[in-house]
């Protein structure tokens, strides 16, 4: 017999550094999920990844207090900042405040990596989404 789903929870957790402190602890604790069990499982699943990389995770918890989780790709903004070698986007994007530049080849690489998480039919559509995110951060797309 299949387990009865009690609900889902979406969090963004840094790879390899899940711990029971806020925001993870309270979010899981109030739903009756074993916090330490999740932290151990998540850290084990992300040990090969770059430490500190933000990982969106969807946790499905069941009425018997068990859970499963699905990890997604890091956000597009993380990849854009990494490729452009910047700490943060422009404070005034679109008003002359440029944070940096990124090439079409870099945009394609990011789009291909994020393809399964984006709502795009093909790579060109995914590239358009990534370019839009880049422009909203104040990055100039060249090439």
From Swiss-Prot:
CDD domains: Ribosomal_L11. SMART domains: RL11. One or more lysine residues are methylated. InterPro entries: Ribosomal_uL11, Ribosomal_uL11_bac-typ, Ribosomal_uL11_C, Ribosomal_uL11_C_sf, Ribosomal_uL11_N, Ribosomal_uL11_N_sf. Belongs to the universal ribosomal protein uL11 family. Part of the ribosomal stalk of the 50S ribosomal subunit. Interacts with L10 and the large rRNA to form the base of the stalk. L10 forms an elongated spine to which L12 dimers bind in a sequential fashion forming a multimeric L10(L12)X complex. Forms part of the ribosomal stalk which helps the ribosome interact with GTP-bound translation factors. This is Large ribosomal subunit protein uL11. It comes from Allorhizobium ampelinum (strain ATCC BAA-846 / DSM 112012 / S4) (Agrobacterium vitis (strain S4)).
């Amino acid at each position: 017999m299949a387990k009865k789903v009690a609900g889902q929870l979406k969090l963004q957790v840094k790879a390899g550094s899940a711990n029971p402190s806020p925001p993870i602890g309270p979010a899981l604790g109030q739903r009756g999920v074993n916090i330490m069990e999740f932290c151990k499982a998540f850290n084990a699943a992300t040990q090969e990844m770059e430490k500190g990389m933000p990982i969106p995770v969807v946790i499905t918890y069941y009425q018997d207090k068990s859970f499963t989780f699905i990890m997604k790709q890091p956000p597009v903004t993380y990849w854009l900042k990494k490729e452009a070698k910047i700490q943060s986007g422009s404070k005034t994007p679109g008003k002359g405040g440029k944070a940096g530049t990124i090439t079409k080849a870099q945009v394609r690489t990011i789009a291909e990596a994020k393809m399964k998480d984006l709502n795009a039919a093909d790579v060109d559509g995914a590239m358009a989404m990534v370019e839009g995110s880049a422009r909203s951060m104040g990055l100039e797309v060249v090439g």
